[in-house]
């Protein structure tokens, strides 16, 4: 999961990895990959100032935290890629997990890995029905790498969860181990939105135009379903492709490579998604009903296949993009609606996996990008995800390792300087 290290396996990046491996084999003391990448400077839009924010450590000792949610009682729930939902109570990370999903999942590699327990979402009426939803990677039949499973669980009256009580909502067949998407969020309409990557592999070599443009697969899409039913799910009649022959009716938007993280603006309901690029470009999109975001015809705003002269008719372009001279894997975040950081009010916060945090400002004519500098945070951390609490404050989920083997993950809250 940790994202698109492997999926955006650029030759330059791989050469760095090979160099690191050689040095390690020689027994030399080296500072790993993050030190190399951290020397790359971001290039925000001219005229936008850098904004500084402090961070407050909420918890460390986590195995690659992939998502966070807030059940309303003061606790914090965190998903670890390895398969646990952990609870932070009164500032302390409890030893016993709320839920252990390892028996349902594939075995997660300790090094670089994109599969695992990837996200959690509370039902809009969680206060009353105590239902929540998870996205995890499960074993698959022969010919597939795994399945991306969305499942429902429910707290008991004692506040516990039976690991065998899960109800599977849907399963996505995954041909390879990367580009899994894996984000789930409820929209203001009460429906569950699910992101799915293109199925993995360099350049989405699944047919002439790839899975992203194939409307008869869930891969490379954002899906929208109604989970308020006793079995499976229902397809909302307002989905854009309902009734169209050869189109999966669950599709809300398409043309994605790996929309690893998306979120809704708490105030407006607008849907933002970061889509991880292939070799050259990272992008952020505003997701609209039925829209085509172009992969693998384009990468960002640039022709990908063919490399020149591609037909961009009908493609919705990103609101921002940046090159691999700056980063390697976009991590979608949230529109800031809290009170701790007035300078960020109404701006979209996101990051790159290598650790640079950004904001987007809507000028009315265009979205402009600026840098966010996080103070009192350890150097060379990888950003895995963001979270948002009930008050609209934003959290940054990080890891000091390249994978989930060691408990070097942490959650930080962005706070006033």
Task: Tell where the protein language model's regions lie, with residue ranges.
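Surface-exposed loop and turn segments in beta-propeller and other repeat-based domains
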Residues: 96-112, 165-181, 218, 229-252, ...
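Beta-propeller blade signature
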Residues: 148-158, 210-227, 287-288, 411-415
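N-terminal secretory signal peptides that target proteins for export/translocation
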Residues: 1-16
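Acidic, glycine-rich loop-and-beta core segments that form the ion-binding/anion-interacting portion
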Residues: 240, 249-289
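Acidic, Gly/Ser/Thr-rich repeat motifs that build Ca2+-stabilized beta-propeller blades
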Residues: 41-198, 261-264, 269-277, 326-364, ...
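Conserved blade-ending motifs and adjacent loop-strand segments that build the rim/top face
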Residues: 367-390
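Bacterial Sec-dependent signal peptides at the C-terminal "C-region" and cleavage site
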Residues: 24, 28-46
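Sec-dependent signal peptide hydrophobic core
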Residues: 17-25
């Amino acid at each position: 999961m940790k994202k698109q290290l492997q999926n955006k396996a650029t030759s330059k990046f791989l050469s760095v990895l090979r160099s690191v491996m050689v040095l390690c084999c020689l027994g030399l003391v080296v500072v790993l990959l993050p030190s190399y990448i951290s020397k790359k400077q971001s290039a925000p839009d001219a005229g936008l100032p850098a904004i500084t924010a402090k961070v407050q450590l909420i918890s460390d000792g986590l195995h690659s935290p992939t998502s966070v949610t807030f059940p309303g009682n003061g606790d914090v729930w965190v998903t670890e890629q390895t398969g646990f939902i952990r609870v932070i109570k009164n500032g302390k990370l409890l030893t016993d997990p709320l839920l252990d999903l390892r028996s349902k999942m594939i075995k997660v590699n300790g090094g670089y890995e994109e599969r695992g327990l990837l996200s959690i979402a509370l039902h809009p009426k969680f206060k009353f029905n105590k239902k929540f939803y998870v996205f995890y990677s499960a074993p698959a039949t022969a010919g597939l790498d795994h399945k991306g499973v969305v499942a429902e669980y429910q707290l008991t009256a004692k506040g516990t969860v039976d690991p065998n009580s899960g109800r599977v909502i849907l399963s996505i067949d995954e041909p390879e181990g990367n580009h899994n998407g894996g984000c789930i969020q409820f929209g203001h309409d009460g429906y569950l939105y699910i992101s799915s990557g293109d199925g993995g592999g360099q350049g989405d070599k699944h047919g002439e135009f790839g899975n992203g443009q194939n409307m008869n697969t869930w891969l490379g899409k954002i899906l929208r379903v109604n989970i308020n039913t006793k079995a499976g799910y229902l397809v909302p009649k307002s989905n854009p492709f309902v009734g169209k022959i050869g189109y999966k009716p669950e599709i809300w938007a398409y043309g994605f490579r790996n929309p690893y993280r998306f979120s809704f603006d708490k105030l407006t309901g607008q849907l933002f998604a970061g889509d991880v690029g292939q070799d050259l470009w990272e992008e952020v999109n505003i997701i609209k009903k039925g829209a085509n975001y172009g992969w693998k015809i384009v990468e960002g705003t640039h022709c990908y296949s063919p490399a020149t002269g591609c037909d961009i008719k009908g493609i919705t372009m990103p609101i921002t993009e940046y090159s691999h001279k700056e980063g390697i894997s976009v991590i979608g975040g949230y529109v800031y609606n809290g009170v701790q950081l007035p300078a960020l009010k109404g701006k979209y916060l996101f990051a790159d996996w290598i650790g640079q945090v950004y904001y987007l400002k809507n000028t009315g004519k265009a979205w402009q990008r600026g840098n966010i500098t996080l103070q009192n945070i350890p150097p060379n951390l990888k950003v895995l995800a963001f979270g948002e609490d009930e008050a609209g404050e934003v959290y940054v989920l990080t890891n000091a390792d390249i994978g989930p083997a060691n408990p070097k993950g942490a959650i930080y809250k962005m706070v006033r300087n």
